[in-house]
A protein has these predicted regions:
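Active-site-proximal cap/loop segments of hydrolase catalytic domains
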Residues: 490-687
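Polar, glycine-rich mid-to-C-terminal structural blocks
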Residues: 203, 207-247
Length: 687
């Protein structure tokens, strides 16, 4: 193919902690610069000419549209018999807020009533629901809406009648990105989190009464440890106690309580200043806290404590001790506790009594299968609720449940659009330092992977996010066509507890890259694929992962998909919300931590003349998490360094009216992934 569009190179360098750091494409950082916008247009045109010419792109797009058009339930919140869901209806571009009943779900008759559709009255499909929170009695819902993938929500309030009729109130509160909402028991208002105008940090808890001007809402909590402190808020069922979890970095939650009957006493620390993760809910009576903590238990334990008593962790009562499973979300369901327990990257839901007796598990005799729990909610009084799970072969499953004294109800499965049977297995292999790493292998059941099998290796490895089973139209489509899809459970995630996370963050980040390299090497060494048939794929922190892989091991694979990536690890904290991530990666302003990130920063390890794998970088102009400048700068540098050697192109696509991924309409997702699939089949020599 012809050479990429030319890119102006400048002599720009900084001296940081005694090290000279070159940055020849810094001018590409300013996305509002007309020259940069023209450069992006030229790059997009070059990429479109290459990918639109691929003979299989239209077929990929058609199948992805069909798979992405399947109904999907993303989350469910129970209030009495009402179940509020964020779900995408068949063929829809965006998620809607819908209403079901527990009885209807249990009887498999669960066609939802749509309460709010962001597409109605919208100019295009880029208007999305970001989050929602129903009131305790289920008659009102606060929800956040944003445009263009920005996730910069404006809070709105719906009143939901007995017949599911909806009235939209006049209340509008901007700057409520990823908002935490705690309704007053009587529904007169709520506590919520909001950002100062024009500020990406200093998230603060306010109180709002319906009908009031939010500009006058009083501050409830603003005791930030740092500007990046991330509070969430909850209220006890009687409204007496305010509970704030303040995330400080990615391995610490400080927890505080306030007694509204004695406000002069001020906030009391439940736990603070300790590098542990503790998340609490109010118990069934509303007089105590119950939750999970990694204090003295890296895999987690369930503890309880009274609200009006001592909060010394030494006095906490352990209900579920640390075991070989990683404990995650906890839900109070009447007289029971539901706890998500993860073993070898597969979730189960355990039922416990408050005295620490294991009562059983949710699901069929085999549990919920090879699946992930994406949502779990119950009515605090009746104990009835619903769990939402996903799997490699299931867009969603709804599992209604009742207290253990009542009979179990069946599950409600999402449709699968004729996907052939898939074989899912888990394997292990040693990393560079001998650590055992796990990996999912997914392929069509009648396929035996071999040297000619086109294979995609995906990973993430960061922010205590576990690589558990997912529903992915891309995986389903790839496997349908005879491909192998591998997902590596790298250090930096939470697959095996907080110690696993710590082993892949800050000074230990290179472990993540070593794990990923070892996964690729294992796939080749065991004959499941070959270098020529291997592609690697990652997005966001996973984009950093594959960026490090292509610069550290250019021999690793034939093709790379690098989506919405972090790649300049020296300047990353200067843009958007990225200072939130210095606790995970390190802060380049600190000499020792600069050394950590400079050692692997992909943008700073591109070597001229190296035959890098074919690389497709894709990003979006509305991304408010990872600035698209990373992909722009890396594309320019790779194109210049390798000259898009031979048949190994370096392509860049920057999507308009889209963001990091949340709120991206199906039409844009199908375009994005059809591009990736067509790029891979081209570079793996199978189209």
């Amino acid at each position: 193919m012809k050479p990429p569009p030319p890119t102006r190179r400048e002599v720009v360098a900084d001296t940081l902690h005694g090290v000279t750091v070159a940055d020849p494409y810094r001018w590409l950082e300013d996305g509002d610069d007309p020259e940069v916008q023209q450069w992006v247009a030229d790059q997009n045109r070059y990429t479109r000419q290459a990918l639109d010419a691929r003979p299989d792109r239209d077929a990929w797009h058609e199948r992805l549209v069909a798979l992405m058009g399947l109904p999907v339930v993303m989350s469910a919140v129970v209030r009495g018999d009402r179940v509020f869901t964020a779900e995408r209806l068949a063929g829809a571009d965006q998620y809607v807020l819908a209403l079901r009943s527990l009885d209807a779900i249990a009887s498999q008759d669960s066609s939802p009533a749509v309460l709010f559709d962001p597409a109605l009255g919208a100019a295009d499909a880029a208007v999305a629901i970001d989050w929602f929170e129903p009131s305790p009695d289920g008659t009102m819902v606060a929800l956040g809406v944003s445009e263009g993938g920005t996730e910069n929500s404006t809070l709105q309030v719906l009143v939901v009648g007995p017949d599911a009729g909806v009235t939209v109130l006049d209340d509008r509160i901007p700057n409520t990105r990823a908002c935490s909402v705690a309704w007053e028991p009587d529904g007169s208002g709520f506590l919520y989190t909001r950002y100062p105008e024009g500020d990406e940090y200093h998230r603060t808890v306010f109180a709002h009464r319906l009908g009031d001007d939010p500009a006058g809402d009083p501050v409830v909590w603003a005791e930030h440890v740092t500007a990046e402190t991330w509070p969430s808020v909850d209220l006890s069922p009687d409204g007496r106690w305010v509970l704030v979890h303040a995330m400080v970095g990615w391995s610490r939650y400080d927890v505080h309580v306030l007694d509204r009957r004695a406000p002069d006493a001020g906030w009391r620390d439940v736990i603070a200043g300790v590098e542990v993760m503790s998340t609490f809910s109010f118990d069934a009576a509303g007089t105590g806290l119950i939750g999970t903590t990694t204090l003295d238990a890296p895999k987690g334990r369930v503890v309880a404590l009274p609200l009006d008593g001592a909060t010394d962790p030494a006095d906490w009562t352990t209900i579920v001790p640390e075991r070989d499973r990683v404990l995650g979300a906890l839900t109070v369901a009447g007289d029971e506790l539901l706890v998500v327990a993860t073993s070898n990257a597969v979730d189960s839901v355990e039922r416990w009594s408050p005295d620490g007796t294991l009562l059983g598990a949710i699901g069929d005799p085999s549990g919920i299968g090879v699946a992930s729990v994406v949502s779990m909610s119950a009515d605090r009084t009746t104990g009835r609720g619903v769990i939402v799970t996903v799997g490699f072969d299931a867009p969603f499953r709804l599992w209604p449940f009742s207290p253990s004294s009542a009979p179990e109800s069946g599950r409600h499965d999402g449709k699968t659009a004729g996907i052939p049977p898939l074989a899912v297995s888990q394997v292990t292999f040693p990393s560079l330092d001998g650590t055992t790493i796990g990996m999912f292998l997914i392929h069509r059941a009648d396929v035996e992977p071999g040297l000619d099998t086109p294979t995609i290796l995906n990973g993430y490895g960061g922010f205590a996010i576990a690589e558990t089973p997912v529903w992915s139209p891309t995986i389903a489509a790839w496997c349908e066509q005879g491909g192998l899809y591998a997902i590596a459970g790298l250090r930096g995630g939470i697959e095996h507890g907080e110690e696993w996370h710590d082993a892949g963050r800050r000074a230990n980040k290179q472990n993540v890259f070593d794990d990923f390299h070892a996964a690729a090497d294992w796939l080749v060494a065991t004959g499941r694929t070959s270098r020529e048939r291997l592609a690697i794929d990652g997005r966001s922190n996973g984009g950093l992962l594959v960026g490090a892989a292509l610069t550290q091991r250019p021999d690793l694979c034939a093709a790379v998909s690098c989506g919405v990536p972090l790649l300049d690890m020296i300047r990353f904290p200067q843009f958007l919300i990225a200072r939130l991530w210095t606790d995970e990666y390190g802060d380049p302003d600190i000499a020792d931590e600069f050394a950590w990130v400079h050692a692997y920063s992909p943008y700073h390890h591109v070597v001229e003349g190296t035959a890098y794998p074919a690389t497709f970088l894709w990003t979006a102009e509305g991304d408010t998490r990872v600035d698209p400048l990373h992909a722009r700068k890396m594309a320019a540098l790779l194109q210049e360094a390798s000259g898009s050697i031979g048949d190994r192109p370096v392509l860049l696509h920057q999507e308009g009216r889209a963001g990091h991924g949340v709120g991206k309409p199906v039409s844009k997702k199908a375009d994005e992934q059809a591009d990736v699939m067509a790029f891979f089949t081209w570079q793996l020599g199978i189209s």
